[in-house]
């Protein structure tokens, strides 16, 4: 039995011909694209109980079945699903690079192979765990025919209309890109995506653990997820996932694929072979479409390859001897478009019009239209705009009620939208205006009468009066750049006794301090004279807006120069539930929010299960000198929707410290969901020490005063183990008379200590400071050096030196923030000297004096020597400089091995993000280079597209490549052919790892092999 049953085009979900196999299935880009999910991040669209493709009763590779599907498709559930190896696959991050999962998938492949053989009747007498084998109706292959009697048309989206919801986790730019992908499908097919209102079945864009995942076709009976996980938010990938939603399978699983491509099985990653199984001819219908190499639903040549340069799918050569390209993720192919139009039975005549203006006409205009013609035009402009349709010619057969030949215009996105008019004859209709941003125009002819036909023009107009309780407003041409010289005015009115709520999904308008050029203006009322709420521009989303009445006035203006992506906003009717007599049913406190409200409790109480009443809670007032604080339910997972506030108070002149023993909260970069906040003071207006989440244990935190506020919040989704923390109070001796210290007093637990400013050392009495010796050796990757006695004038007759060393492979940089040394043309008196090496005999980088801040100085290697000299006469303020490191540079290789590290803080911290470093290793002429990786840990990706180390056998990147590396485990030794090697280290802005350590040397090596065997 084939792994999935369906048609070409990655194979269409063939309900069109009445053939449905397996029901709902999911395709995960953790398998399709090699993208994986972090595991700690969750989509926040949790109020929607959607069908999650990451959870299923049975998994066959990237195919998921639940109990309903097993019944619908007459599959006997004879395997114990609580024990079978399919069960856990849906709860991983995609499985790539996971050795245990690869082994499990290897076993899975064997089981799938057995299922296929059972389906062909080859093991009719075998059983699984003493049960009847897994069977499919029509088990004997020669009896296998399309099951027209069980046609499942509900898997096609009715009318080609797909309602959608975008989860709250996504940024404005991501939302815009999702809409661009949907408009791309709309432009070329008759499929329509609409924002969901009250439709029962719809899709939800989410961020789920299965990476890029989607069901194939319409699931029905409620919402279904389309997961756009980590690294999946690319236009082509979203178009691909929407292809699955519409009804497409992967092209390379067509029954006839062996006539067009060759599967090179020895190059496939172990355990991933099942991704290359094909469907059976009796189980699918290709709808007459040819194999499409260019399909956006086709795997690339190296998908699931053991190496990025090894092919797993090799396309056959065409008539010109050229192998077609496969695996593009740029746009729909002609085959994709043709297949979708067949699947959804799009009329051959008509199109989707998305420009701000355009025209349409009957076929053959003005030379007459054919009989029995059916055309549909869908006009779709930016939400917040209206469509004005003007007929310029009308010459159709006239009949009673326009029964035969007619044009219908509807105010909306499909054939059931409100009718604006039905027209025939030769009388021009009045100008028609839509109430929203979509219009449906349908033309039918059934007579043999010959007339010119019709012609019409349309134009999108922005602004106008909007009288409804909810909707969307976007800048003209959103999500593309808005047009120049536009002025749009919207007057929004909702039901009486309500307010207008306005929230922004994305916002990008030309920036100016006073918003003088392009801007959005919002006023609290019905006109430009109403009170101003705000004039907005720039890239920060405005705060949510709530009018004081049931009206809101908005104006968008663009000038003739810079154009940006614009804005997208939702408006809705809003009421203040807390102003009602029962305060929303809240027992203690009612907090009104835009579009809703929530109950809250006083400190020491928490909301009960009904979310309205209050009960004794976590938190409270703590006056002990020490104690322990834990999250509710410790050591089990903390419950959702908790808000705990601890107020810790100590005696006067004491300070409170908190040390976490264990810490694990739901993680997010901005700690938006579950978090702990620690304040110096008892209110949320005090000094905030930090907001913490994730699994990294915070440092010890000490209050500024004798009280501290600790607040824990959890949302309604993911729960973790929580935290356990100890607090303790200590007397702050420094708070009185500086602890007797001459310079600085530092409080410590149970005691205190004195410190001296730069250039001084602590006296034996541990309180006073005396002038320090002026020789320092510095080994830290960054820090501060100053002239003696800084910030006061430096003393006379002083000589100070600094020997600065950094990590091998990194150059030292010295940058001055202040500089004032006695001026002399040749710096003969007081001066600062900087040397490119470890001693004053090294090449000099500069001899400095005067009042001008010098340019930064960069050494060629990882050592720098700095010397300051003052004479007996004039003294000045001196200098202050920071030393840091820069990666890259030219390094000389010798016969003695040398080291090179990925980053200056190797061993202490992971490498930073957004780095591009190049090292040029050069040996003596006639010698070669040997490179040996001592440590290697770089973010893993199949094509090494995110973080990587790339080597070239020469002076620059045009030389022969020695390899691009990522992942864990050091590569084998590398030998150059020439006397130089260029090393390029690149990192993106997300996952950071330990990095690498290379040991290199110059050798005499006659062999020309690059890699040691």
Swiss-Prot record:
Disulfide bonds join 190-346, 210-232, 212-213, 349-375, 402-424, 462-488, 515-537, 578-590, 586-599, 601-614, 618-644, 671-693, 734-745, 741-754, 756-769, 774-800, 827-849, 887-917, 944-966. Zn(2+) binds at residues 240, 244, 250. Its cofactor is Zn(2+). Its EC number is 3.4.24.-. It is linked to Atrial septal defect 6: A congenital heart malformation characterized by incomplete closure of the wall between the atria resulting in blood flow from the left to the right atria. Protease which processes procollagen C-propeptides, such as chordin, pro-biglycan and pro-lysyl oxidase. Required for the embryonic development. Predominant protease, which in the development, influences dorsal-ventral patterning and skeletogenesis. This is Tolloid-like protein 1.
């Amino acid at each position: 039995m084939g792994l999935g049953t369906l048609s070409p085009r990655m194979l269409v979900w063939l309900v069109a011909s009445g053939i449905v196999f397996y029901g709902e299935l999911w395709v995960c880009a953790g398998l399709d694209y090699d993208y994986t999910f972090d595991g700690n991040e969750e989509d926040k669209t949790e109020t929607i109980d959607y069908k999650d493709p990451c959870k299923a009763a049975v998994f066959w590779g990237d195919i998921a079945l639940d109990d309903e599907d097993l019944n619908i498709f007459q599959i006997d559930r004879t395997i114990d699903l609580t024990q079978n190896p399919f069960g856990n696959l849906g709860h991983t991050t995609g499985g790539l690079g996971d050795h245990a999962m690869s082994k499990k998938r290897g076993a899975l492949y064997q089981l799938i192979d057995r299922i296929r053989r059972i389906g062909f009747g080859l093991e009719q007498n075998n059983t699984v765990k003493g049960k009847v084998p897994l069977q499919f109706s029509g088990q004997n292959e020669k009896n296998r025919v399309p099951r027209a009697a069980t046609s499942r048309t509900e898997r096609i989206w009715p009318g080609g209309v797909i309602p959608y919801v975008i989860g709250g986790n996504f940024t404005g730019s991501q939302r815009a890109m999702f809409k661009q992908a949907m408009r791309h499908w709309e432009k070329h097919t008759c499929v329509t995506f609409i924002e969901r209102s009250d439709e029962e079945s719809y899709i939800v864009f989410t961020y789920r653990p299965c990476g890029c995942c989607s069901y194939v076709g319409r699931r029905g009976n409620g919402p279904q997820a389309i997961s756009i996980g980590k690294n999946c938010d690319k236009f082509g990938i979203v178009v691909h996932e929407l292809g699955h939603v519409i009804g497409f399978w992967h092209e390379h699983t067509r029954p006839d694929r062996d006539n067009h491509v060759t599967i090179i099985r020895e190059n496939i990653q172990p355990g991933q072979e099942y991704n290359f199984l094909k469907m059976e001819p009796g189980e699918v219908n290709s709808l007459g479409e040819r194999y499409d190499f260019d399909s956006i639903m086709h795997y690339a040549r190296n998908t699931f390859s053991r190496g990025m340069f090894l092919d797993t799918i090799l396309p056959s050569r065409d008539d010109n001897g050229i192998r077609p390209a496969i695996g593009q993720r740029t746009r729909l192919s002609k085959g994709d478009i043709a297949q979708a139009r067949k699947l959804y039975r799009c009329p051959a005549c008509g199109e989707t019009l998305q420009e701000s203006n355009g025209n349409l006409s009957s076929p053959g205009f003005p030379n007459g239209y054919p009989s029995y013609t059916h055309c549909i035009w869908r006009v779709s402009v930016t939400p917040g705009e209206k469509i004005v349709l003007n007929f310029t010619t009308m010459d159709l057969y006239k009949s009673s009620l326009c029964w035969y030949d007619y044009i219908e215009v509807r105010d909306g996105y499909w054939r059931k939208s409100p009718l604006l008019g039905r027209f025939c004859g030769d009388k021009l209709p009045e100008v028609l205006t839509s109430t929203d941003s979509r219009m449906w125009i349908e033309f039918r002819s059934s007579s043999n009468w010959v007339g010119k036909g019709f012609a019409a023009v349309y134009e999108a107009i922005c602004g106008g009066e909007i009288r409804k309780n909810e909707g969307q407003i976007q800048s003209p041409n959103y999500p593309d750049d808005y047009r120049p010289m536009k002025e749009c005015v919207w007057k929004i009115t909702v039901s009486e006794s309500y307010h207008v709520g306005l929230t922004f999904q994305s916002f990008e308008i030309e920036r100016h301090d006073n918003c003088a050029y392009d801007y959005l203006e919002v006023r609290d009322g019905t006109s430009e004279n109403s009170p101003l709420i705000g004039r907005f521009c720039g890239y920060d989303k405005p705060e949510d807006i709530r009018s004081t009445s049931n009206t809101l006035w908005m104006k968008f203006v663009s000038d003739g120069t810079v154009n940006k992506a614009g804005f997208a906003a939702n408006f809705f009717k809003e009421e203040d539930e807390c102003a009602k007599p029962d305060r929303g049913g809240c027992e203690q406190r009612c907090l009104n929010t835009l579009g809703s409200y929530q109950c809250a409790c006083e400190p020491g109480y928490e909301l009960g299960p009904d979310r309205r009443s209050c009960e004794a809670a976590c938190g409270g007032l703590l006056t002990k000198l020490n104690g322990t604080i834990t999250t509710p339910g410790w050591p089990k997972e903390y419950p959702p929707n908790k808000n705990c506030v601890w107020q810790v108070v100590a005696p006067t002149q004491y300070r409170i410290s908190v040390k976490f023993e264990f810490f694990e909260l739901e993680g997010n970069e901005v700690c938006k969901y579950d978090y702990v906040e620690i304040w110096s003071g008892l209110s949320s207006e005090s000094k905030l020490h930090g907001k913490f989440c994730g699994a990294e244990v915070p440092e010890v935190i000490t209050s500024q005063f004798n009280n501290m506020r600790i607040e824990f919040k959890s949302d309604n989704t993911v729960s973790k183990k929580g935290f356990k923390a100890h607090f303790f109070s200590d007397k702050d001796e420094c708070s009185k008379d500086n602890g007797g210290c001459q310079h600085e007093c530092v409080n410590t637990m149970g005691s205190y200590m004195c410190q001296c400013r730069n250039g001084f050392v602590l006296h034996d009495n541990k309180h006073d400071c005396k002038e320090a010796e002026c020789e320092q050796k510095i080994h830290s990757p960054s820090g501060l050096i100053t002239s003696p006695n800084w910030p006061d004038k430096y003393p006379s007759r002083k000589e100070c030196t600094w020997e600065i060393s950094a990590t091998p492979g990194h150059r030292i940089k010295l940058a001055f923030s202040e500089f004032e040394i006695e001026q002399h043309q040749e710096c003969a008196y007081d001066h600062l000297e900087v040397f490119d090496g470890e001693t004053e005999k090294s090449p000099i980088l500069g001899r400095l004096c005067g009042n001008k801040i010098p340019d930064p100085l960069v050494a060629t290697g990882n050592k720098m020597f700095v010397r300051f000299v003052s004479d007996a006469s004039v003294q000045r303020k001196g200098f202050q400089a920071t030393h840091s490191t820069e990666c890259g540079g030219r390094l000389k290789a010798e016969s003695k091995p040398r080291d090179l590290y990925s980053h200056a803080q190797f061993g202490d911290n992971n490498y930073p993000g957004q780095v591009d470093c190049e090292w040029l290793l050069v040996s003596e002429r006639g010698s070669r280079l040997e490179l040996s990786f001592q440590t290697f840990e770089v973010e893993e990706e199949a094509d090494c597209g995110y973080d990587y180390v790339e080597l070239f056998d020469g002076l620059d990147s045009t030389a022969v490549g020695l390899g691009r590396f990522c992942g864990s485990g050091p590569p084998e030794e590398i030998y150059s052919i020439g006397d130089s090697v260029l090393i390029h280290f690149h990192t993106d802005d997300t996952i950071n790892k330990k990095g690498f350590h290379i040991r290199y040397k110059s050798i005499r090596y006659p062999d020309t092999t690059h890699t040691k065997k």
